[in-house]
């Protein structure tokens, strides 16, 4: 890596997902607004709180809801059946 290309605030930051109780130490320039947290190694790091991450997002955890697409398609067809039938009669 080239020397002296990173901003002054490039440091190790703790990204912590409180809903999954999991965190990652990553070098970043992310603003932490003065929040810190003691990590498992006993050191205190700037803290960037996450609302969701790959540890808590339903798509990554496999707990997503399946949308009933058949029901939605049939509702669409019922609503626009008259429009479609008049369109077919005109041709």
UniProtKB/Swiss-Prot annotation:
Cellular component aspect of the GO annotation:
ribonucleoprotein complex; ribosome
Query: What GO biological process terms are annotated to this protein in UniProt?
Result: translation
Q: Which keywords does UniProt give here? A: Ribonucleoprotein, Ribosomal protein
One Pfam assignment: Ribosomal_L31
An MF annotation (GO) of this entry: structural constituent of ribosome
Entry's family note: Belongs to the bacterial ribosomal protein bL31 family. Type B subfamily.
Description of how the protein assembles with itself and partners: Part of the 50S ribosomal subunit.
- Report what the protein is called: Large ribosomal subunit protein bL31B
Species the sequence originates in: Neisseria gonorrhoeae (strain NCCP11945)
